[in-house]
A protein has these predicted regions:
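Bacterial N-terminal signal peptides that target proteins for export
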Residues: 2-20
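Hydrophobic beta-strand segments within beta-rich accessory/binding domains
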Residues: 65-83, 123-125
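Noncatalytic modules at the cell exterior or secretory-pathway interfaces
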Residues: 76, 115-133
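Short, surface-exposed beta-strand/strand-loop-strand elements in extracellular ectodomains
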Residues: 84-101
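Extracellular and analogous surface-interaction loops
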Residues: 58, 65-73, 113-118
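Extracellular beta-rich ligand/substrate-recognition surface
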Residues: 51-62, 101-104
Length: 158
């Protein structure tokens, strides 16, 4: 049988573990919420099918996040190009989709195809860590999303 001191120590240990786990989970949730609120919204002018965003990652920055809304079966193309006047290019692009999937690659056209779900899409633009010299990395990203009527023939079987 455990003594009162041992039972108290076990209860204290369990309480501490529960508290630490709760703090860790809250921290993860807060960081996730913070990441989404710091996304830059990509705006499309009325009647426009594309929007261009430019940016520079400082030497201590690794990535920048953007977001836009689109519908399932809309055809999209996302292209990342160098930004004039910067010695490095942030050329890694990954499109995070509302259904939890993601797709992307390094430089050029990082996504081309029919969007799989309706909702908020998040675009991560990052520097290529294998090809960086720690300088400012610029980028120019064009996001083109065709309207549903123009996407019909391209996404008919999707």
């Amino acid at each position: 049988m455990l003594s009162i001191n041992n039972r108290t120590a076990l209860s204290s240990t369990r309480a501490l573990k529960t508290l630490l786990l709760s703090a860790a989970l809250i921290s993860v949730g807060a960081n996730s919420a913070l990441a989404k609120t710091s996304d830059t919204t990509i705006h499309f002018a009325k009647g426009a099918i594309s929007s261009v965003v430019t940016g520079k990652l400082k030497p201590n920055e690794q990535e920048r996040w953007y977001r836009f809304n689109a519908a399932a079966a809309q055809y999209a193309i996302i292209n990342i190009a160098p930004l004039t006047g910067t010695s490095e290019t942030a050329n890694v692009g990954v499109l995070h989709m509302p259904n939890g999937k993601y797709d992307g690659t390094k430089g050029g056209i990082i996504y081309q195809g029919c969007l799989p779900a309706t909702g908020e899409y998040r675009l991560r633009i990052a520097r290529n860590l294998m090809a960086t010299h720690g300088e400012t990395a610029g980028y120019k990203a064009e996001v083109m999303v065709l309207p549903k009527f123009a996407s019909k023939s391209l996404c008919a079987d999707k």
